[in-house]
Amino acid sequence: MVFWVPILAYVAVVLLTALSFARAAPPRGPALVARLLLRYICLLPVGLMGLWGALGHLVFPAQSAAAIGWTTSPFQTEVGLSNLGIGLAGVIGAFYADRGYRLALAVMTAGFLGGAGI
């Protein structure tokens, strides 16, 4: 199930973007598509999945550690709190449509998740 959650989140992003674009009043253009994509990416893959990751690391540390091959340690609390911050920032970014805020969120998320993937 864990494998499918990110894939389903991105499928939901595409579907919600298409639905919102179809319901938007004219004129509709590429700028609207970009804003809608950013909104739903902030909400689902960044926001809700960040909160989900925080829940796993903070509330179920033993199961999370076993699932990713770690030993249970205080580092999980650090990762869980980082996920909590990213998740909250993502949910805020979905509804606070400031370009600078969303850019900062993208840079921070890319740095954290890119570093975690290396």
Give the positions of each predicted feature.
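Hydrophobic alpha-helical membrane segments
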Residues: 82-86, 105-118
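Membrane-helix boundary/interface segments in integral membrane proteins
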Residues: 66, 86-98
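Short juxtamembrane and helix-loop transition motifs at transmembrane-helix boundaries
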Residues: 38-42, 62-73
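Membrane-interface helix-boundary motifs at transmembrane edges
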Residues: 25-41, 96-101
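Juxtamembrane "helix-exit" motif on the non-cytosolic side of transmembrane helices
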Residues: 22-27, 58-65, 118
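Hydrophobic transmembrane alpha-helical segments in integral membrane proteins
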Residues: 1-18
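Loop-to-transmembrane helix junctions at the membrane interface
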Residues: 68-72, 98-107
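Core segments of alpha-helical transmembrane spans in multipass integral membrane proteins
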Residues: 43-59, 74-91
